[in-house]
From Swiss-Prot:
This is Antiholin-like protein LrgA. GO terms for biological process: cytolysis; killing of cells of another organism; programmed cell death. The lineage of its organism: Bacteria, Bacillati, Bacillota, Bacilli, Bacillales. Belongs to the CidA/LrgA family. LrgA subfamily. The keyword Ligase does not apply.
Length: 145
């Protein structure tokens, strides 16, 4: 009797690396055809999200590698820090402008995040409220029968 492969069983680590590498490779190809500049890593994140949502890629096929990468994310930011050090000449020319830009962009990010969160909360509370209202109406209709 043949054993069927369990779909919920996590894939081997090497298989997970290959899946993520293929997604990144496809995103690099997509990046080369895009009319606007967009990092392949961002395209890859969106592509992987779509693949996970559609079920084309199962969570078990990327979970272990994703967790490992997330746990070591500080190490992955070292190249970005080194490139900032290489740009100290540019930063030293207009430090107040750069600090101001950082402050303004942080405030705008917080405001936008707050508004988006409020919109999502309103939409989800309406849908939950509609379900509760329908349930109450059904119970009232059954009580009158």
């Amino acid at each position: 009797m043949k054993q069927q492969k369990d779909a919920s069983k996590p894939a081997h680590f090497f298989h997970q690396v290959i899946v993520i590498a293929l997604v990144l490779f496809v995103s690099k190809i997509i990046e080369s055809f895009m009319p606007i500049p967009m990092p392949a890593s961002v395209i890859g994140l969106v592509l992987l999200f779509v693949l996970l949502c559609t079920g084309a890629v199962k969570l078990g096929e990327v979970e272990k590698v994703g967790t490992t990468l997330t746990n070591n994310i500080g190490l992955l930011f070292v190249p970005a820090g080194i490139s900032v050090v290489n740009s100290l000449g540019v930063i030293s020319q207009a430090p107040f402008l750069i600090i101001g830009l950082i402050i303004v962009s942080t405030i705008l990010l917080l405001i936008c995040t707050g508004y988006v969160t409020q919109i999502i909360m309103k939409v989800t509370s309406r849908s939950k409220g509609d379900k509760v209202t329908k349930k109450i109406k059904i119970e009232e209709a059954q009580a009158h029968d």
